[in-house]
Each structure stands twice: as structure tokens, then as C-alpha cells.
Amino acid sequence: MLWKLRLFWDRLELGAIGFFAVATLVIGSLAAAMLGVFADRDARAKREREYNAENIACLARNVYFEARGEPLAGQYAVAEVTMNRRGWGPFRKSVCAVVYAPGAFSWTGMRRLPQPGGKAWDIARSVAENVYWQKRAPTLPGARYYHATYVTPGWAKEHQRLAKIGRHIFYR
């Protein structure tokens, strides 16, 4: 096989300079193709990191505004409900789409919200990361609804009550 290539090259009468020119083009093309593959992989990994960070931030804000001041178990339960809604029914695939779906969580309709901060924000971020990355076993599998104990929404009768944690009642 190699002798055929050599014979072909000799017929072209390009000599050593031609050989090196063609070799440089071939090697350069291969290098550019490989660089493109690795650059695409790096860009995809960066987009995935940004997507995950954005979803964790949305989940943390939801935990903060819905369950700040609740027992830790209640904050985890709110995060679980949020994650359970992802990809289900009227909700989309991203956590942010679930959190900001119209009417899904009361705080998203408020015009002025305090900037999250302090120890409560640190706890909310920790809870969000643990639930998002599934570092903790769910305590309310299948829970998709909850409400505060001081209200009785009409939809509550249609769903199975799972637990009361802090000032929230959770349903499947």
C-alpha cells in the first residue's frame, strides 16, 4: 500500500517541498478538527455548569422565600416539591421554569422582595444544592403540592395529605 502512495507521489513530481506542503495541510486540518471537537466539548460543559448554577439559584430562592424560618425538614420538603414538579404536568424541564410558572409560588408574584442574605440564605443554598444533586434521600417522595397551615385551598381535598412540617402541609 505504501509503495502505491510513493509511486503516486513520484508521478506528481512535486519533490520534498510539495510533500511537506501537503503534509502540513493534512496535519493542520486534522489539528483544527480536533481543536474544534475539544472546544465544542468545553463550551458544552460550560453551558451545563451555567445551567445547573442557574437552576440551583432558582431553587435556593424558592426555599428562601417559601420556607425561610421553617425547620430544616420543612425547607428540604419545599425543595423536594419544587424538584418533583420538574418535568411534570404543566411544568417545564428546568427548575427555574417550575419556580416562575404563573401561580406556582406566591412570592414570585410580589413586586418588592428583600435581597436574600445572611444565615437563612446560606441554609437555603445548602438545601438547594443537596436536593438538586440528590445528596440526601427524599423525605416526601411524590409530593407536588403544599400550602401554609393558615389557609385551606380548594385543591387540598383532591390530593393525598402526606405530612405537616412546620407551618406547611404537603400533598401528593
Language model: regions and residue ranges:
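Bacterial extracytoplasmic/cell-wall-associated proteins, especially those involved in peptidoglycan
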Residues: 2-9, 15-18, 36-172
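Hydrophobic membrane-insertion alpha-helices, especially the h-region
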Residues: 16-34
